[in-house]
Amino acid sequence: MAEQTRRDFLADVGRGMLVAGVGYGAARDLGLSTAWAADDVPDSLTFGDREPLVRLLQDTAADKLLPMLVAKWQSGTSLRELVAAAALANARTFGGEDYIGFHTMMALAPAYQMSRELPSEQSPLPVLKVLYRNSQRIQEHGGHKSEILHPVALTDATSKSSTADDLHQAVLGKNRDLAEQHFARIAQRSADEAFNDVLEVVQDNTEVHRVVMPYRAWDLLDIVGREHAHTMLRQSVRYCVKAECGNHNDYARGGSRLLPKLFDQFKLVGRPLGTKFAEDGWVEQLS
């Protein structure tokens, strides 16, 4: 694996946050997701073959967890699988609504990336650190019994033609259940469309967690699998609905009002991209 420079890493992060912040189209397919009719919705959200490992991470006390995870790794369970199970356990438990919980989710992909750049005998260390924090917070939250995410029951309040505007209006109206239904309808058609449409809601303001969350969920799809895109992106829908109920949201909404004015003022729509290279000295001066 080629060594990644600090500049390359920051460039990757910057590109991802720009996509999440201003709503540009997704660059690749994120897979499909599942929603349910109201009359056949199951009680619990489950994850197939990964469910036993997900439950282990939810139900095991943090002080007993690490020896079990090391034993699993030594017996052949990959770090990738451990991180995937942790991401799904985190999403199902917190649903993007717990401050420590979603910060832990955001740390999972970077921890896995760091593990791939370490010598084999040291590679589990960054992953184990975040998995410990993840399970510790899940236990503080109540474990498996306190899960936030459940299968979405679809009702006549939404239709297969739900749009980004429908989702947006439900979020602005602080109607979490309706927003979840619209988003599930959208995700049934295309996870790529779901990602783009949730970004239209995210870009309403520039609050940092709101911007970073869908980018980190996107990043984790390479680990958990694109079939879990709906589960991972639902966290942003719920976060945005919750944000509408707080005063901080009005403070952070200024960007959504200013950005269109700047685009018009400087005629940025359709303008050719510049070719000036950001020299190290210029970057240093700017920062």
Model-identified regions with their sequence ranges:
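Mature, well-folded catalytic/scaffold domains that follow N-terminal targeting or propeptide regions
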Residues: 2-287
